């Protein structure tokens, strides 16, 4: 496995760029690492405000499960997908997701964060958004790996599919009021991300 060695894509000349042409959307890690960092700080602040009563949590789902979901399926998913969509470009030689496609994926991720905080009881809408985010990312990563016949990396698709299942099961559990079961799926997701980290560590 070759080390990650990216050539920075930059505009060929200075001009007024449309949003999908911004350097921010030329590589997957750029928007997702930025958003993951910002969200990790904001989510912790919101959690602190909920704990001390500054913010009133009105949803039926326990705030602890909102916090767990956002740290695991919000923050961690952004880091994982941002990294994989970028690193796979080196592993496969296939261009990673960029431009309008990357903007759409980022918009889905942001929408899911907003839905869960402002409309936490609408678990069905959040479920659709989260599944769409995972499937979009998995589909493009699969395209990169299959196009290059990078069979030894197919395991990553399997792990991401498991994380999609855990995320969906978590949201279905909260929708049905099975909060103990939802906590179980957060624990399984943590193990899933640990497995993904171990696999990536063996690649780089």
Go through each PLM region and give its residues.
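Hydrophobic alpha-helical transmembrane segments of multi-pass integral membrane proteins
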Residues: 1-204
């Amino acid at each position: 496995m070759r080390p990650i060695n990216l050539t920075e894509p930059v505009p060929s000349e200075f001009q007024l760029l449309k949003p999908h042409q911004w350097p921010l959307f030329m590589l997957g890690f750029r928007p997702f690492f930025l958003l993951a960092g910002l969200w990790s700080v904001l989510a912790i602040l919101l959690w602190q405000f909920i704990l001390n009563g500054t913010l009133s949590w009105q949803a039926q789902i326990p705030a602890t499960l909102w916090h767990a979901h956002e740290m695991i399926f919000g923050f961690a998913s952004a880091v994982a997908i941002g990294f994989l969509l970028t690193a796979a470009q080196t592993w496969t030689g296939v261009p990673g997701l960029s431009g309008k496609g990357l903007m759409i994926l980022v918009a889905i991720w942001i929408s899911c964060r907003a839905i869960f905080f402002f409309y936490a009881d609408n678990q069905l809408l959040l479920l659709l958004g989260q599944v769409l985010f995972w499937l979009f990312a998995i589909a493009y990563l699969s395209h990169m790996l299959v196009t290059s016949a990078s069979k030894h990396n197919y395991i990553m698709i399997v792990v991401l599919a498991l994380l999609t299942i855990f995320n969906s099961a978590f949201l279905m559990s909260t929708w049905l009021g099975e909060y103990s079961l939802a906590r179980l799926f957060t624990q399984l997701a943590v193990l899933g991300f640990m497995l993904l980290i171990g696999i990536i560590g063996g690649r780089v």
